[in-house]
Amino acid sequence: MTRIKLLLPLVILSAHTFLLWGQEISIDQNRVQIPVLKFKSFTPVLQFKINYTKELNVKKVLVEFEGTTNISNIGTVFLFDMGKDSTWQADRGNLVRQKALTNEHAVFTFSNPQQLKNNYFIVAVKLLDNTPLNHSISAGIKKVTFLESQPLTPSIDAKRVKQRIGVALRKGGDDGIVRYRIPGLASTNENTLLALYDVRRDRGSDLQGNIDIGVSRSTDGGNTWEPMRIALDMGEYGNLPQKFNGVSDACILVDKNSNAIYIAGCWMHGVIDSKTGRPATDLTAGSTNWNHQWRNYGSLPGFDINKTSQFLITKSIDDGKTWGDPINITKQVKSNEWHLSAPAPGSGITLDDGTLVFPTQGKDKDQIPFSNITYSKDGGQTWQAGKPSYSNTTENMIVQLSDGSIMQNMRDNRNRHEKSDSNGRAIFTTKNLGEYWEQHSTHHNALVEPVCMASIYKHTYTTINGYKKSIFLFSNPNSKYKRERMTVKVSFDEGKTWPEKYWLLLDELGLSGGYSSLTSINNNTIGILYEGSQAQMTFESIRLDELGINDAQLP
């Protein structure tokens, strides 16, 4: 006897799956923690995939925004067909529908059903410009309707997230600029936020190139920002094209005892041949010579501007509105035998005794990188450099401890290969402005890194009971392997421990350089500027209660 298997065209298995011609059809939904940004065309809020190897006819997609702080913050909802692209880069997909959001649901309908198979989709939103930074967005797929069957709900559903609101402060293409990199952030004595960054005009790579230092100001806690200003631009100095007069890696320092604000930058004039160690000659706008201050012979011993990178400082005395002509302090802070002395990007500090301190970095006589500090004890009139704290380290930031000493938190090149429990930031302290350094107990064992710039910052606040408290904050890509998972961490014991209970994940995607800079906005709020997955310069404000700190007075 011959047995015949009858294959039904459609079998309903559940609200999550059905069989069509013997093949199971289902929907996977995925959410990630990334910020939803103001002043940007759209930001992804969820991804879903329809699992079926043959063509299906989609009639309707229902998206819900239950749990969103205020639906009226969302102006437009977009649906992108990403094809087989599983990334979260919606601009690489095909926009198939968009509509204004009037309630907690967005319904995308297709009069001519879309024929799809195994496709990824992204739902994205555009925020209104007046969306408060303390709001959040939450989204999910309610159901998808097919011509062939009843509606389906997702069978694999990633954990629901509340996406924080941020600002797309700088995006590639803004003001005709190719790329913005290297954030710094500070609060002035007038409670103005100053954000600074590399303005990489022609291409995205590091020095040497046509790069200036840009500044953005905010007087409302980061909700809105004034147009970009340029703080450091060496133009066509020495009759060389701007591509051979780049300034990069800026650091900002607010003098807490005066109206002075300083920005330091690394200036390269011309370019040195990486093979011969000699300055290139006859450079023109069409010359393709390139080298970088950290590469072989990128910067040489001595002080000649044609041979060694220069340490520049500019000053503002009007709350960051205008910036003075640059002052070259290379001869004050660089040892003649060093190949390089340069600012470390981010922000500097004012010590309790009024000393101004920049985190700095360099290369010694053997071209081995090091970290150190550069300081002024006379209100910025003159500057001195401390001795190297540790070798084979570079970018760093500093905080003052309660005993008056300085803690330096450093990017360590050893971590390129060290992925064991010994992976961690290099940490040293000094009690005498870098004359001598001591290894800290958390050296190489507390804060993991993928070898990347990071930020450490001391925030002092008043409690509900009127007491003063200080906490340390740290931000970096929280990974040993990739520049992903931008995270803020808190220490209540001056950097000895960083309990995971007080970590806040801001952006888990690894689509950026991963640099960051922290500052205070007010008693109860922290600001961060970082290189994020959704904008080259992303700004967010963070309330202390979001970090698990609930005893701060509200402003």
Can you say where each PLM-predicted feature lies in the sequence?
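Compositionally biased, intrinsically disordered low-complexity segments
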Residues: 7, 14-15, 30, 402, ...
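Asp-box/BNR beta-propeller blade signature and adjacent active/binding-site loops
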Residues: 42, 56, 84, 92-105, ...
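Bacterial Sec-dependent N-terminal signal peptides
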Residues: 1-23
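Short alpha-helical "patches" and their helix-cap loops
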Residues: 9, 139-141, 361
